[in-house]
Amino acid sequence: MGFGTDDMRIRDSFEIAKDIGLDFSFVPNEIETDVHPNTVDILMTNENEDHILIRGESLGGGKARICRINDVEVDFTGEYSTLIVIQKDKPGVVTYITKCLSDQDVNIAFMRLFRESKGNTAYSIVESDGLLPENIAEEIRKSPNVSDVMIIQL
């Protein structure tokens, strides 16, 4: 919701979330015991009933880390504008993504590729120094090897 760590609205964040139509619930994880103490799993569902499960960790001091998307271990902080591409693990897909970014003068600060297994679903995480163009997700989605694109803008 874009709140800073010292934002006074944090104490009312649950009500604010409900007011803007964000449906949420808290379910304690009683199965996994070997996770960071400030871990949250977020199951997101869109209007088409597509699901994605994100695991994040609060590291303190307003810092957080995303460590899992679905069942794939990833690692990024969200300190930069971030592009998350869910794709097939095939030759040429990363080249396509970087060409789309280059064509729009996006400077890549960090880029990592994570995958379920060879030839299966992969996740490209691209962190940029600046804001990502509004239409970059639409451009990248044009590839038949890309199933979804998400953007975290700072």
Where are these regions (language model features)?
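A conserved regulatory-domain signal marking ACT and ACT-like small-molecule sensing domains
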Residues: 1, 7-14, 18, 24-29, ...
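Short beta-strand scaffold segments in enzyme catalytic cores
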Residues: 40-43
